[in-house]
């Protein structure tokens, strides 16, 4: 296998079987495992068509002829090929004559242990790669946060026994760089925790190390706080989580499909429970005071009442002029103010 795995020089390996996993205590049994040639590298799973027939639109580096049918219990045919991501020139080394990888595809390589005191590329699916100075410790590079950036040869084995599921995010103000052995953590600058406590919240992005096909005929519920999920469908029965602002993720049944997490492009800010204001229910009258159906339906953050417009075009509460049409409150900071329609 050639070491040049950057875009434009991709190499595919023959398809290997996908095995349905069954959750047991402490992990998964019969996980999807990559062949030995996939070890110590970063890999990108390329799923083929359900019929596993060669297609004209096959991804770059996916040899249609190597896509062989693989039968899962009670499902249609599923096959895949391993396509390596950049696995060689992950570190910018001066004076070696080697051209560095493209910034957008650079990945730390477990076989590289000479990158100490050099700049290692931190590639993440959500943003442009950034290079950070590394500190040499026992032949491996350690990032400032303590996570390994460059591992010694043989220390990283991206097998399914190590990566069985995608972890949830944790709202901790920690920024860590990418590692071949662990998911990539990206900081969402506009992301706020749903609990409204104010600390910065990160979103999880998953490295294409080892994909797990969950059991068929079962519900898969994996909420990701502060980030909508992106579903990629395959061939099983499960549920797809559809998060919404200010609400926990809502799971919707998707017949005859199952999904695996893919990297999400951007971190979107969810609606914080501190400043989710709901409009009051007001009745427009021709004259006199406006009547409202019960107390204003605001949360506990002290949202002020909106402008209940009367037919005379005045607001009895504030005395300011209002248009004789319905006013909808808009949420600004932690209070609502009237908006003229």
Swiss-Prot record:
One of its GO terms (molecular function) is structural molecule activity. Sequence repeats lie at residues 5-9, 115-119, 120-124, 150-154, 240-244, 276-280, 307-311. The keyword Repeat applies. Pfam families: Keratin_B2_2 (PF13885). It comes from the Eukaryota. The keyword Repeat applies. Residues 5-311 are annotated as: 7 X 5 AA repeats of C-C-X(3). Keywords: Keratin, Repeat. One of its GO terms (cellular component) is cytosol. Belongs to the KRTAP type 10 family. This is Keratin-associated protein 29-1. It comes from Homo sapiens. The gene is KRTAP29-1.
